[in-house]
Amino acid sequence: MTRIQNSHFRQEGTIMPVIFSEKKRHEISRQIKEAALRLFKTKGIRKTTVAELAESVGIAKGTFYNFYATKGQLVAEIMDDFDAASERELRNKIGGRDKIPIAEFYKYYVELFRPDTAFSFHFTPDDITVMQEMEETRKFFSQESTVYKGLHRVGI
């Protein structure tokens, strides 16, 4: 993993943020998400600090907030990514059909949550409770979730 240099420099006694290119912003954001998943898996969301996330990718704690307003916003973006990937995967599997047999959907759903590939496997049991409490992630436990919509669509 490439370490990112400190994103602040001193100019006339002040600390000024460095402006990142879109490409660099995307790369740093990806690194933050990867670090978050690693740390969440071992420590949980509640015990993972913004300082640890920033340090793990080589940025200042304050620079983290140039990417995410809160840790909850980071978790929500990770969940959005998973939700979008799940929807793409489901669309690929159903091949343009409007409906699929329940057995086929169930097979897909079981594959999606296999422990070796599952998004949920990156979180501790306490994390589900934490995510239900976070305003930024609450929607994933409601009817807005792609997985929830898919289950509802097939009558589950």
Where are these regions (language model features)?
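Hydrophobic alpha-helical connector segments
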Residues: 77, 91-118
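Helix-turn-helix
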Residues: 31, 39-73, 77
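A short, mixed-charge helix-start or loop-turn motif at secondary-structure junctions
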Residues: 17-19, 68, 133-134
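N-terminal intrinsically disordered/low-complexity leader segments
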Residues: 1-27
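Alpha-helical DNA-contacting segments of helix-turn-helix folds
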Residues: 75-82, 89
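Short secondary-structure transition hinges
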Residues: 111-156
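Short C-terminal boundary/hinge segments that cap the last helix of small helical domains
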Residues: 44, 88-93, 122
